[in-house]
């Protein structure tokens, strides 16, 4: 796997979303139901923000409360960083590290086509390393057998 497109082909393109008016309680339930760390906030087909477990943790610590009936738009991150399916896994790692983020929506020609997480990136890197190791082991074994 070399690109975001490869990751999406492996994991699928399912994106869980909420609307800006969805309550924080419903947002938390959606995160739990789908066992995901972030949801995109979408309105009229446009990404308006992203809300993550980290957003909840920071806001609760900041306010010392979680008003569960508030709309998610009051807590979401509004400046969403998105990537193209053609971006490399290495570029994603650098971007996530530099911006201190764990989730990246994937947009192709203005259309939302998926979302990737730091966990997806780690799995892709490990898979690539395992393939490299297996290839090297096979090469070494073949060299021993030929000598």
Spans of model-derived segments:
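Tandem CBS (Bateman) regulatory domains
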Residues: 1-13, 52-82, 88-97, 118-147
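A positional/architectural concept
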Residues: 2-48
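The conserved cystathionine-beta-synthase
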Residues: 18-35, 82-100, 107
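Short, charge-rich amphipathic segments
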Residues: 22-33, 64-75, 110-111
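A glycine-centered beta-loop-beta connector
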Residues: 31-34, 39-55, 96, 104-120
